[in-house]
Amino acid sequence: MSQLLSVTRGLYSMPPAHGSAIVDIILHNSELTRQWQEELGQMRQRIHNLRADLVNVLNQQQDERDFSFIAHERGMFSFLGLSVEQVHRLKNEFSIYMTDTSRISVAGLTVERMDYVSQAIVKVLRP
């Protein structure tokens, strides 16, 4: 057990340098920095588009609840404002996973699955 603790402590006290070494290489090479910034911009735009698509599809499928706040947020996640019971129904009935606080990974959505996810959300909103 003491050997395991020793190894574990070493990992936490001295985290691997791989990540920082990669960042160092990218930021000290102008071509790699440009490529990284371009890819980052593409991912930012993808998430922005997914947010807009989610709002549009949800609004087309129901009109009881305003989901426009999703389009105005930033980042990879969004809180949907669902109850714990509704979140559990999404998980158990539709295999859609999120935290119990209804925080969904927008970055994890795809255009192909948008209708399915939206329809499931609408179904759990209705009694």
Model-assigned labels for residue ranges:
Residues P15-A17, F69-H72, M98:
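A structural signal for short secondary-structure junctions
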Residues M1-Q37:
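Conserved core segment of the aminotransferase class I/II
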Residues G10, L32-T33, E64, I96-Y97, ...:
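A general structural signal for well-ordered secondary-structure junctions
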